[in-house]
Swiss-Prot record:
Its EC number is 2.3.1.-. GO terms for molecular function: acyltransferase activity, transferring groups other than amino-acyl groups. It comes from the Bacteria. Keywords: Acyltransferase, Transferase. PANTHER family: GNAT FAMILY, PUTATIVE (AFU_ORTHOLOGUE AFUA_3G00765)-RELATED-RELATED, RIBOSOMAL-PROTEIN-SERINE ACETYLTRANSFERASE. This is Uncharacterized N-acetyltransferase YnaD. Signal peptide: none annotated. It holds the Pfam family Acetyltransf_3. Coiled coil: none annotated. Belongs to the acetyltransferase family.
Amino acid sequence: MHITTKRLLIREFEFKDWQAVYEYTSDSNVMKYIPEGVFTEEDAKAFVNKNKGDNAEKFPVILRDEDCLIGHIVFYKYFGEHTYEIGWVFNPNYQNKGYASEAAQAILEYGFKEMNLHRIIATCQPENIPSYRVMKKIGMRREGFFKKCIPKGNEWWDEYYYAILEEEWN
């Protein structure tokens, strides 16, 4: 994957990216809504290695002007060949600047135009207001609420379920 927007580049991971990934994935505030929790350096290296090549599900988001990795986009097959899930995690230094929306919008375009997808979904915890604001901003609608569906330690998290169809995106 290689997608360019006005300010961003979305590409495949390179091993050298692990340090930038570790910078934000080691932050408990960033990772509080991610079931895997806070990353160690080894977790960050494994994450980057796992997401290289044809089976990648996560892609770095690069700020073009600074050639700086500012977060990553999640994009993978959710159901059949026609439905993918999208998500995002960003370094707190680059949050609230429209980067997540810009990257997500580019992924929607890629999914619908290049991959001929029918549907793209996204999920988040109800407390993760910034994430579902991005979902709304890119045209997704809330389709559901799943009670206690994601295990996190000894707890269960609730989730909102958002989606957009190709015909709604156009």
